[in-house]
Amino acid sequence: MVGSVLMQRMHAERDFALIEPAFFSTSRVGQMGPFIGKESAPLKDAMSVKELAAMDVVVSCQGGEYTNAIFPQLRASGWKGYWIDAASALRMRGDAVIVLDPVNMDLIKDALSRGVRNYIGGNCTVSLMLMGMHGLFKADLVEWVTAMTYQAASGAGAEHMRELVRQMGFAHQAARAALEDPAGAILDVDKAVTSALRNGSLPSAQFGFPVAGSLLPWIDKDLGNGQSREEWKAQAEGNKILGREDRPLPIDGVCVRIGAMRCHSQALTVKLRRDLPVDEIEQMLAEANEWVRVVPNEREASLRELTPAAVSGTLQVPVGRVRKIALDKSASYLTAFTVGDQLLWGAAEPLRRMLRILLDVAS
């Protein structure tokens, strides 16, 4: 799915006109490659180290198992090319950079000058948080952050998106008779939906539990300390992206899966290093990069512009609900709410832009 979105973005930005691509597959070797404005050659074998080693750049959206199987073999063969990857497998390696160029372009340029060859996309939620709050991190105003996330089905995969829609349909069908009865009581509708979610017949092979009409308050593995792996990534990856591994900012929170299709949302609480007026903070956020848009902290604007429905399929990362909160009179605390497309800035776009950076370096 990330690969499909990456292809769409490369078409839209005319990237294919700048490169000579070869396409690889683990399951459809020899079949015709994708149409890229012209016919492409048959698909090559993605398990062939020899064929991969002929590439100057490999862009992988195949997942961590593939990376763990092929990457060591490819490097062991003597390949000196650039590896760009959506998977998490290599993110925390010392010889890899997590790429988010609007935020860490200086880090990327420094790595290129030092001969670093591995450039990895970050965790979707972490990347979207850093894009939205870039202005505060850039100004070194952040002492710590907590993020309460509302994560879309797309973060779990394409089949999870399909299952979410099936669950929605299943719940509707279960309550349909009560819903369409003009004299019916809403409690009858509620009872029918609740029964559908609990009776074991709801499609749940992917999630394991109901998401439609419910939520999942745990994402990824249990680290055994009360924290999920998804929650751990915020501080680990966030500080690596910011180049602060030697002086890490505390970043933590609770990650929750909800019934949105492809946009992650986050409610943030930030402790600031110094007190600033809200209008100055909003200006910093708005000017940090061209994709952030500050939404006025007003009811209508928030409901219209600060939702997955409004943002899905766009590169915009709106930030709203920005206000001070009185947790402690001796310090300055801020709340904010941000939304972003998990498949764009959360996955495909940093990879696409890293490829363009390499092309610029080569030229």
Q: What does each model-found stretch correspond to?
A:
Residues V58, A153-S363:
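Charged docking surfaces used in two-component/phosphorelay signaling
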Residues M1-Q206, D246-P250, V317-P318, V322-D328, ...:
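N-terminal Rossmann-like NAD(P) cofactor-binding subdomain of oxidoreductases
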